[in-house]
UniProtKB/Swiss-Prot annotation:
SUPFAM superfamilies: Phoshotransferase/anion transport protein. Keywords: Cytoplasm, Kinase, Phosphoprotein, Phosphotransferase system, Sugar transport, Transferase, Transport. This is Mannitol-specific phosphotransferase enzyme IIA component. Coiled coil: none annotated. The PTS EIIA type-2 domain is phosphorylated by phospho-HPr on a histidyl residue. Then, it transfers the phosphoryl group to the PTS EIIB type-2 domain. Homodimer or homotrimer. Seems to be a monomer when not phosphorylated. The active site is at 63 (tele-phosphohistidine intermediate). One of its GO terms (cellular component) is plasma membrane. One of its GO terms (molecular function) is protein-phosphocysteine-sugar phosphotransferase activity. GO terms for biological process: phosphoenolpyruvate-dependent sugar phosphotransferase system.
Length: 144
């Protein structure tokens, strides 16, 4: 999974007015990486309008609806570190991982990210690091 995380797709020390702005940033990063078309950003917002992608432990994983499969060009991940947090419905997200999975890979990606974030120590390291390499190391050490 760490092969999908490039330093260019890890954004440290971000701040956002609201979850919609964070979704736009995550979606645009996926567009810029060549993983999705622009349509995918709206699909991420559409999913969020139906069901929150907040997973607990300060983590939100916005991703597109099933109808947006055609907007996914290749699997991709982007991570936004938000030390001060952003309001996400009734919760506060400190890490937002935007995902796009090709050929059903999104379920595997969701599972691996959720497992990594189930450990409070991993969450703390990701929220507080100043290095993209450290974030990748957390996922590698979680061995997911």
């Amino acid at each position: 999974m760490t092969e999908l995380f490039s330093n260019e797709n890890i954004f440290l020390n971000q701040s956002f007015e609201d979850q919609n702005e964070a979704i736009e940033k995550a979606g645009q990063a996926l567009v810029d990486a060549g993983a999705v078309t622009e349509d995918y950003i709206q699909a991420m917002k559409d999913r969020e309008a139906v069901v929150s992608t907040f997973m607990g432990n300060g983590l939100a994983i916005p991703h597109g609806t099933d109808e947006a499969k055609s907007a996914v060009l290749q699997s991709g991940l982007t991570l936004l570190q938000i030390p001060e947090g952003v309001q996400w419905g009734d919760d506060v997200a400190k890490v937002v991982v935007g995902i796009a999975g090709k050929d059903g890979e999104h379920l595997d990606l969701l599972s691996k990210i959720a497992i990594t974030f189930s450990e409070e120590e991993n969450v703390d390291r990701i929220v507080n690091t100043k290095s993209p390499e450290e974030i990748k190391a957390v996922f590698e050490e979680a061995d997911v």
